[in-house]
């Protein structure tokens, strides 16, 4: 269950990049007391960390998203524990009567820990479904090529806007929310934000901002965390 959840939580953030093939898969980063699954397409980065895995030591590998998707679909129907063994080129997943052998992506995965914001002091707590529904509604009026939306955050409220000047379209919604920090205006590609919010199962999300030019950190609220801890990093875009 944990492995399937980890794949499901990260696979949508993998890239289709012929130049950087290591980003076309999920990075399995094992430590002595935890396992972290990471995926990124350079616009968004998703980490899923669990302490339920029994790990023999520090190690890592990159599994291409295609076998990862197959593995997840099989694990969704099988609730047994999974044994993972690998070398420099191959990984073997064994569970129940099944053995799945996959070729690994060879190369160095980006240093993902360096891009995770540590001191974003402006914090928004908001109902995930409410934010998701609002972004979907507003994004209908966004430019179809860019999908840009803008969040204007002030104490106790969030304003979400989108516009398509070519078709004279605009949308605007104001939400009451729990926001503490300096006023922040930040732009995102709406489809990326929708993906992240859709793939979190929590009731409340926490978004942490430094300013409008640096990446936002998106995590479930602490009371919603269960077996795995998820964090998402979303790069901003310039908006007027």
Where are these regions (language model features)?
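DNA polymerase processivity clamps
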Residues: 1-49, 53-105, 120-240
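Glycine-rich, pocket-lining loop/helix-strand segments that form or immediately flank
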Residues: 108
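Bateman (tandem CBS) regulatory domains
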Residues: 115-119
